[in-house]
Amino acid sequence: MDQQQTKTRGVADIVFLIDVSGSMAPAIDALKANIGTFVESLSKGDANNVSPVRDWRAKAVGYRDFEADTEPFIDNPFVNDVEALRTQLAGLQAEGGDDEPESLLDALFKVANMGQTDKGAQSLDPAKWRYRSDAARVVVVFTDASFKPAMSIPEARGGGIQDVTNAVINNRIILSLFAPDMPGYDELSQIDKSEWEAISYPGLDPQQALVKFTSDQTNFKNTLRQLAASVSKSAETIAL
């Protein structure tokens, strides 16, 4: 194995892309309370994760309806400290976005195209991905809503799911979706290496279902450990 491949293994940039419309407060609280479980499993390993990530950065990004809400996109810098990440999560306020659908495609497009640090740079830009061969890039989505089929951001106005798919693939991003069992998410989950946990319970609407999913502390901790193992596995793969 050459030096570049050895360098790449065990390195990951992770974006938690979270719907911060009004109904999402319980899910955000659950993430804030349990993010330490994710980071510990990611960086130290456990029974599910035998190849922990040795070098990680993460950030929490919020999105709402890009057409209806005054603050539709809440960005943060990449950090490599669990308390700093928890502080970012605490800063995401669940409000607005009362009417579905939300603007997930716009948010994904912006995150995918945030740019990358120059190859061989001596320092990392906290506003950009690492250079593509230096780290796995993972975007973890939490939402309880459907999404608009067309984007409204100026740089991609009128674009749809195929444009987002292209952006995700071209920027070497792996998607992990925690989202309702609704049309559209199956299409996103078909992007290479993507995963979709369809959140659904008999008799519950999507908002109630995500509350139930995240409020079961034992199961949610296990979910985050499994997510950490999945991210670690992605970080084992060489990003070309």
Describe these PLM feature segments.
Residues 1-240:
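Divalent cation-coordinating acidic motifs and surrounding scaffolds
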